[in-house]
């Protein structure tokens, strides 16, 4: 019987990732559609992705599929064809290529979830397939210059911090579930105005447009392919990219650079910086922005307290090694 999950240690997988020289592409895709047997669907995906040395994170739920993956470049066309033929619902699936191809994932993880994006929506009559109008880069740029159009960022606050469209409204939150509750209340005054919603790859803003329509908003739009799709389309058509800063990504890269503007600040000294790290003291692991100077000063920790704890931990480890 095949083992349909990872059995190699995280440390070893990370080591393999950093030493691998094979060119890879980082891809993302999603689709809202009904999946009857999620376990069977998940297992078939795992077997085939494993065969093509795919790494990454894939969620399967009765409402659809959501994936961020790293694929050997030589298998890209084969994998694309496989996905199109895997399920009729995935035929001509939109696949986003990342803006850079730095090392992103080190393990293949295919999980069954209740939902492919946690939204907290419990209304029985909510229809996620009733969505807003897709727009591409030319229309996005035009609407950004229209003062009557409202842009709403449907990403978490820490994502918004390092990059966003100018004048886009931030729905301050750390979860999408929380955002959906807030956005209806905060935007109640704009039910008859043009609203454009965006996120990284499209999955959150697509569901957000459904939620807005369900709650009586009349003119709702969203970026086809999210920020990633917008940037690719603008560059392809020679249009200015109006997104400022970096786009946060949920993998080893942490972010993708889109423009040269640095619009965020170091948590510790307040200087301009757009580099996210996790506190080096593993019991803390706080995600925060840190400049190069503070990285040296605090040993990549978020505070003096964590730095002291980290140094004490490392000293104890060194003493144990000596004693052996």
Swiss-Prot record:
Record field: catalytic activity: uridine(34) in tRNA + AH2 + O2 = 5-hydroxyuridine(34) in tRNA + A + H2O
Described function: Catalyzes oxygen-dependent 5-hydroxyuridine (ho5U) modification at position 34 in tRNAs.
Biological processes annotated in GO: tRNA modification
Active site residues according to the UniProt entry: 199
EC number(s) given by UniProt: 1.14.-.-
Domain Rhodanese residue range list: 145-239
Pfam families: Rhodanese, Rhodanese_C, UPF0176_N
Stretches of the chain forming a coiled coil according to its record: none
Name of protein: tRNA uridine(34) hydroxylase
Species for this entry: Buchnera aphidicola subsp. Acyrthosiphon pisum (strain Tuc7)
